[in-house]
Swiss-Prot record:
Consequence when changing residue 650 to S: Reduces ATPase activity and interaction with eEF1A. Required for growth at 37 degrees Celsius and causes a 50% reduction of total protein synthesis at permissive temperatures
Induction annotation: Increases in strong (1 mM) hydrogen peroxide stress, and decreases in milder (0.5 mM) hydrogen peroxide stress.
Stretches the record annotates as Disordered: 974-1044
Reaction equation(s) it catalyzes: ATP + H2O = ADP + phosphate + H(+)
Class of the enzyme per the UniProt entry, highest EC level: hydrolase
Cross-link (Glycyl lysine isopeptide (Lys-Gly) (interchain with G-Cter in ubiquitin)): 350, 636
GO biological-process terms attached to the record: cytoplasmic translational elongation; cytoplasmic translational termination; translational elongation; translational termination
Record-listed E.C. numbers: 3.6.4.-
Entry text on domains: The heat repeats and the C-terminal domain are necessary for impairing GCN1 function on ribosomes, and hence preventing GCN2 kinase activity in amino acid-starved or repleted cells.
Residue positions where Phosphoserine is found in the record: 642, 974, 1039-1040
Keyword Lipoprotein: no
Lineage: Eukaryota, Fungi, Dikarya, Ascomycota, Saccharomycotina
This protein's name: Elongation factor 3A
Amino acid sequence: MSDSQQSIKVLEELFQKLSVATADNRHEIASEVASFLNGNIIEHDVPEHFFGELAKGIKDKKTAANAMQAVAHIANQSNLSPSVEPYIVQLVPAICTNAGNKDKEIQSVASETLISIVNAVNPVAIKALLPHLTNAIVETNKWQEKIAILAAISAMVDAAKDQVALRMPELIPVLSETMWDTKKEVKAAATAAMTKATETVDNKDIERFIPSLIQCIADPTEVPETVHLLGATTFVAEVTPATLSIMVPLLSRGLNERETGIKRKSAVIIDNMCKLVEDPQVIAPFLGKLLPGLKSNFATIADPEAREVTLRALKTLRRVGNVGEDDAIPEVSHAGDVSTTLQVVNELLKDETVAPRFKIVVEYIAAIGADLIDERIIDQQAWFTHITPYMTIFLHEKKAKDILDEFRKRAVDNIPVGPNFDDEEDEGEDLCNCEFSLAYGAKILLNKTQLRLKRARRYGICGPNGCGKSTLMRAIANGQVDGFPTQEECRTVYVEHDIDGTHSDTSVLDFVFESGVGTKEAIKDKLIEFGFTDEMIAMPISALSGGWKMKLALARAVLRNADILLLDEPTNHLDTVNVAWLVNYLNTCGITSITISHDSVFLDNVCEYIINYEGLKLRKYKGNFTEFVKKCPAAKAYEELSNTDLEFKFPEPGYLEGVKTKQKAIVKVTNMEFQYPGTSKPQITDINFQCSLSSRIAVIGPNGAGKSTLINVLTGELLPTSGEVYTHENCRIAYIKQHAFAHIESHLDKTPSEYIQWRFQTGEDRETMDRANRQINENDAEAMNKIFKIEGTPRRIAGIHSRRKFKNTYEYECSFLLGENIGMKSERWVPMMSVDNAWIPRGELVESHSKMVAEVDMKEALASGQFRPLTRKEIEEHCSMLGLDPEIVSHSRIRGLSGGQKVKLVLAAGTWQRPHLIVLDEPTNYLDRDSLGALSKALKEFEGGVIIITHSAEFTKNLTEEVWAVKDGRMTPSGHNWVSGQGAGPRIEKKEDEEDKFDAMGNKIAGGKKKKKLSSAELRKKKKERMKKKKELGDAYVSSDEEF
């Protein structure tokens, strides 16, 4: 093919035939044209003249359909000639215009031709093709043309997915604008094209949110909820321009929301997204949308804390984007611009004789080079493959390759090189060798860090609470870590803390069998190897203690033939014997293990390597925990629980009437026994103990011995089968359960602040309202039928309303039902009026109405000013005492918190009412060593009593004085100093509370000043003054309180 006289003559004849073709022979002639153009090529020539005529034919209404049909046939040829391709792309604007033609046939042919061109063009030539489509859709007012272009863009995603991903920053604004078109057909097509385009966002973290992100573009009212959803998402994949292009429209609108909370949340996400950006050019195209919104919010938001967060995001954006002090937005790099690469090509060709007719081909080469730069393709052979066919159109192959290689070198000099991994000295089979980033919600945890694991090695992970240890484990298990091998390549099993409650009635054997890990015989053998008896294998999971549940989860993981075991605090629920068994198993099983543990002795006995969180990186240290501490001095804080900068503080408990010393018993249990319904013997029996404000008690014993059952009876979760349990009338007990998340699992979509407001909105703790000691059972109902003789009439108590001091105890105001015809068929009980209320001493009431008395006692305690105002500031201050930042308390949903942060929230909520006794069931389960050290110090300084169930002798050795050893259902106390009466020691004086007091509605209670006792002389003087006034005024005299 050439512009020689012979070729021109043939093409002119074909074009004449094409111009007068009818619908019947149009396809045949178009096919002849395509075959000729894509046939044998005469070297160094192009069909410039023919395509010029073809362009005129497309613009002519009479020949448009035929001309476009020829283009479609040319594009549909399997061997599209490089000499033809650049010229076809130049026809796209004219074809787009015809897609909006009034003639339906021309419309249809134009739409089909656009699809054919998109599918035929080299994907790396997208920078030559896409601008024609986006310019046409912006400039046209014809809705049919817009729909055809949108269909072509959707087809382009399939034809050139990787290349479209890089063009998303300029494509998304065009599609977004089209989604607001007034024509519903255009809206639908634009939404479909946007959905198709977002397939290029290869980011597992936001895949499920993409429909919501698209919906936000069409419906801005969805922005607040979507911002919340993204705030609780774990980001582990690299944030690319494609990811930012779909996220930034949401965030820019979030910055413009009326609600301060959404503006603030958007700023937090921007702040943390920017921290993941190492190349300023990635964020550069989006600075114009984010920077003005942040600046405006910083200047106008009234909330100082939200303004501070906005300023932090602003500083981060300026730093990452290289924004100057004058806030002038720097230019985006032009290295990948077609104009830049065209200039380079023209400079290299200036000494060559290149005819003007090849100008379009040269521009096409520049467009391909620009895309290769954007894709960071720097391989010489790749450039030869993509560009040589076009450059040899006007140069000999050798010359073309020489110039092309120089073009490549000039273009890629400043492209960042990918990460280099240092080889380990340790030999062995690699299971994993990857680089990735990790975030949790709006917090960046790891940024472009390396993880390399070998087969049959044992690794421990260390780091402060909230740094992302458990998040990393879950991300690995869920396949969300970039570069980590899939489950097919390397079976990775995450051993959970707890077994899902939905399996509580399933037998141990069936539970493992349902996982599809083998036959029942093989499962049974493995469970026996793990220490399970035949009886335990047959019992339901709910009957297992926490330690045995952990062993069951571990056994199931081993049965799955794991290559890597992920163990998150495996010793939490295990006693000493089972911990020793686990150490031996991990050291001999030959399975790679990654362990998170706050037990330094366990890490010493198991680990060969320690992986430490340092900054936003993972750093590996060879050796066990002791060796790690030697190499990393900063890790010495792990050795001593009290060696930490983190501080916890529990609120001071309120005054208890009648309790003059810290030794006086405020809880006392005598001859107590408890047996679960349906069991053959009591779980605990013959239990005697007492607790005071000075108690520091450790409850120890093997798994299943009855420790948690004993504490449940103490706190009122369970009622004893027999025996007596005395609790001071105003005593408040904070109980943090072994499975701490049980407190908050139904409130995951609330913020911590909202959860505390919900829990205490009535003044009472709603978490304790369903305790057994507050529920009226059949025995209580029968006892409450007791008949009292009041003023000679038989009465039953209808309600107890208030309380007042009576000698050394209390008496209670009761309303009654009056009995008529008692013992007869016509017996009835009639409500009496309030004037018939009477006061009954506590001793008489508790025999039959103890739970009603307890309710009044609780309300009286709250009415005396123990209630705290449920304001954001008060809640944030209280939670900060337990190590929770205001950012987390008021602006993060519970679902997005780490395990350690959730337990801190449970501690904060449990101590909101200033308890007198704090009961902790396995507090070492989820807190890291820093937090455990802070908890240890706070418990030492706490003014109330402390009871701890734990297997960790290290945690309790310097904290507790009294030990309750529970074994086989019996409790043996030691180290106790129980007293009868007040006991010795310093006296507790009731403090005049200087702080403001509030009732249950948050209203300030005015505290009256205590009256000064008058002397005898002052009393006589006042009496004389009263007598004088009475004499002067006569019957008009009315005395006042001030006169006495």
